[in-house]
Every structure is written in C-alpha cells, then in structure tokens.
C-alpha cells in the first residue's frame, strides 16, 4: 500500500529488499536494492546490502566492488568488515587493516548475533568468524568485546 502511495520511496523499496534478503531470496533482494539505488544513487546501505546478497550467491568479486562503492560514500563499519571478509583469502594484510578500522568504528560487529541482526548471511558470517580468529586481530577482537561489555 505504501509503495502505491509513494512509489519512489527508496527506503521502503530498500526494506522490501531486506525482507527478501532475510528470506534468502537473493535475486529478488538485489532487484529491490537496484531500484532503491536507481532512485537514490548514493544510498550506501542499499549498495552495501546488495554486496551482502551477492556474497551469499558466491559472487565475491561483485561483493568487493559493492562494498568498495559503499565505503567511498560512507566509511561505515559494515561495508569495511564486509570487504575485509571478501579479501580474507586474497589479501590478508588489507583484510586485517580493514577489520581493525571496522571494529574501531563499531565494536558491535565483533558479535555474531549483532551481524545477524544486520542481515548478514551464513556464508559471510562464516568468512567473518574465520577472519576474526586471525592471530593479528586477537587484541582488536578482545578490545571490541570489552567495549561492548562495558556499554551494556
């Protein structure tokens, strides 16, 4: 009903994309994210979530481009960590650097359940969990967890 009243509401269209993402219907989620981005080209959240969907479809190269584009608009923790997870097997040095930056911006991303609430799929979650076990990140992971615990 809301979209019939306001068909160019990029946020409403984005939320429909998120519903499809939660239902693991990645192709439809991507279509809605595309519509949202067409209306508002710098809507980094839709660009980011399109990257999440492509990761679950094993299209890592496309995810990388989308996360990089989202970061170029808004250097937010979510696309930083998404990109880091994509690069985990390609460039571990850069992946570690991006992870440190992401956890510094928002320590909540160290938490599996928090990422799940942000609609991260199983494949990206698994990749991120592996990345967070990297020896070079242990101090950052502990620090992020302590920041979460001290704020709750």
Question: What do these predicted ranges mean?
Answer:
Residues 104-152:
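Terminal, low-structured helical/coil segments at or just beyond the last alpha-helical repeat
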Residues 15, 49, 82-83, 118:
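Canonical tetratricopeptide repeat
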Residues 10-11, 26, 44-45, 60, ...:
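Helix-start (N-cap) detector for alpha-helical repeat units in TPR-like alpha-solenoids
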Residues 1, 22-35, 56-69, 91-98:
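Structural signature of tandem alpha-helical TPR/SEL1-like repeats
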Residues 68-77, 81-111, 133-137:
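TPR/TPR-like (Sel1-like) alpha-helical repeat modules
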Residues 19, 53, 86, 119-122:
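TPR/TPR-like alpha-solenoid repeats
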């Amino acid at each position: 009903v809301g979209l019939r009243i306001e068909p160019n509401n990029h946020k409403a269209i984005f939320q429909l994309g998120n519903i499809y993402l939660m239902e693991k219907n990645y192709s439809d989620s991507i279509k809605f994210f595309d519509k949202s981005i067409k209306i508002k080209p710098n809507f980094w959240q839709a660009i980011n979530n399109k990257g999440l969907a492509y990761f679950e479809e094993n299209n890592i190269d496309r995810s990388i481009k989308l996360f990089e584009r989202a970061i170029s608009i808004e250097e937010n923790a979510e696309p930083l960590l998404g990109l880091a997870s994509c690069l985990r097997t390609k460039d571990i040095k850069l992946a570690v650097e991006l992870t440190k930056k992401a956890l510094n911006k928002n320590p909540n991303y160290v938490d599996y359940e928090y990422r799940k609430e942000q609609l991260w799929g199983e494949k990206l979650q698994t990749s991120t969990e592996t990345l967070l076990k990297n020896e070079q990140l242990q101090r950052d992971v502990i620090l992020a967890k302590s920041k979460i615990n001290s704020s709750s």
